[in-house]
Swiss-Prot record:
Alphabetical list of Pfam families matching this protein: FAD_binding_4, MurB_C
Full protein name: UDP-N-acetylenolpyruvoylglucosamine reductase
Keywords attached to this entry: Cell cycle, Cell division, Cell shape, Cell wall biogenesis/degradation, Cytoplasm, FAD, Flavoprotein, NADP, Oxidoreductase, Peptidoglycan synthesis
GO biological process, one term: regulation of cell shape
Pathway field: Cell wall biogenesis; peptidoglycan biosynthesis
Catalytic activity annotation: UDP-N-acetyl-alpha-D-muramate + NADP(+) = UDP-N-acetyl-3-O-(1-carboxyvinyl)-alpha-D-glucosamine + NADPH + H(+)
Localisation: Cytoplasm
Functional note: Cell wall formation.
Gene3D superfamilies documented for this protein: 3.30.465.10, UDP-N-acetylenolpyruvoylglucosamine reductase, C-terminal domain, Uridine Diphospho-n-acetylenolpyruvylglucosamine Reductase, domain 2
Ranges for domain FAD-binding PCMH-type: 25-197
EC class name: oxidoreductase
Gene that produces this protein: murB
SUPFAM superfamilies referenced in this protein's UniProt entry, alphabetically: FAD-binding/transporter-associated domain-like, Uridine diphospho-N-Acetylenolpyruvylglucosamine reductase, MurB, C-terminal domain
Active-site positions on this chain: R173, S249, E345
């Protein structure tokens, strides 16, 4: 799909409601909002006198944010579209997508065009532009494994810059854009390197169980089989944000050192854990939360999902303060019972 022509004109929408722009469905408002469909619009922002001294927030699918109050600035709705193969060599395809493209639709598109690799990341909510910020991951795969580069615009100067993987400094659900670069850049396009030699990632039992239920052995599984299995698992475990507001997994799986893990295992031998290559141990945050008795419980209109303890939901009319109060109560209980700190994935504003 070709990228549409440049048009840097910016139309501001005053007192704009944000409930439809965050997957929690939290009712908040922005002083202004603007729909961004071209990189040139991001590049022109610093010259717009209407935006002088106003805070700016780039928003994609709104699946990684909790509004605790109205936003007294301009929300920039990233709707930059486009998907294309920018080049190809003997080993891989290099595929670019606009920052505003829906992530799941992009993953499906790569498979439909015979370019597998991203199927373990199917049905993750959000946009392509948000994927590198969080270094999204699921079922044994992180986005960084197939990341090539991205183009971002520095909002204060309008300068367009290219970032390779080293400059992005990816970590576990982390990147430069969540730390030093937070709030400074708008990601307008991301390029992925998809190897022509497909490497299935079937290390998670959930995926192999779902394949087995479909009569498919790991050896016989195709990229489409893995995609379908991941979609089925996520739909069974995670609520649809259009039905029950949520931001997917609310907490990161904590990573602790070996000594701390030994002490924890002495108290809770059945703790669900995943050894890491560096000797540390990743814990299943959902298991910790469940063991503290939070699954299915509520505080006001915010609740823990009854099938997946990692997911906090809006039962209807929840405010960002409600969600934050629930998250803090869970963190306090996990800290008290297991001595482990849980870190929230979404940004709370």
């Amino acid at each position: 799909m070709p990228m549409p022509p440049d048009d840097s004109a910016l139309s501001l929408l005053p007192d704009h409601p944000l409930a439809a722009h965050n997957t929690f469905g939290i009712a908040a408002r922005a002083r202004f909002a603007a729909r961004i469909t071209q990189a040139a619009q991001f590049e022109a922002l610093h010259r717009d006198p209407r935006l002088a001294n106003l805070p700016q927030l780039v928003l994609g699918g709104g699946s990684n944010i909790v509004f605790t109050r109205d936003f007294d600035g301009v929300v920039l709705l990233d709707e930059i579209a486009g998907r294309r193969v920018v080049r190809e060599d003997d080993d891989a395809w290099y595929v670019e997508a606009g920052g505003g493209e829906n992530w799941h639709a992009f993953v499906a598109w790569t498979l439909e065009h015979g370019m597998p690799g991203l199927e373990n990341l199917a049905l993750i909510p959000g946009t392509v532009g948000a994927a590198p910020i969080q270094n999204i991951g699921a079922y044994g795969l992180e986005m960084k494994a197939y990341f090539d580069s991205l183009v971002a615009v520095e909002l204060a100067t309008g300068r367009r810059e290219r970032f390779d993987a080293a400059r992005c400094a990816f970590g576990y659900r982390d990147s430069f854009f969540k730390r030093e670069g937070r709030g400074r850049f708008a990601i307008v396009a991301v390029t992925f390197r998809l190897p022509k030699q497909w490497m299935p990632r079937l290390g998670y039992a959930d995926v192999t169980r779902e394949l087995d239920a479909r009569g498919i052995t790991p050896e016989a599984a195709t990229p489409r089989d893995v995609f379908d299995a991941v979609v089925a698992i996520r739909r069974a475990k995670l609520p649809d944000p259009l039905v029950l507001g949520n931001a997917g997994s609310f907490f990161k799986n904590p990573v602790i050192d070996a000594a701390q893990f030994d002490a924890l295992r002495a108290r809770a031998p059945e703790v669900v854990s995943y050894p890491q290559p560096d000797g540390q141990v990743k814990l299943a945050a959902g298991w910790l939360i469940d063991r503290c008795g939070w699954k299915g419980r509520a505080l006001g209109a915010a609740a823990v999902h009854d099938r997946q303890a990692l997911v906090l939901v809006n039962r209807g009319g929840a405010t960002g303060a409600d969600v934050l109060a629930l998250a803090r109560a869970i963190q306090a209980d996990v800290r008290a019972q297991f001595g482990v700190e849980l870190e929230a994935e979404p940004v709370c504003l």
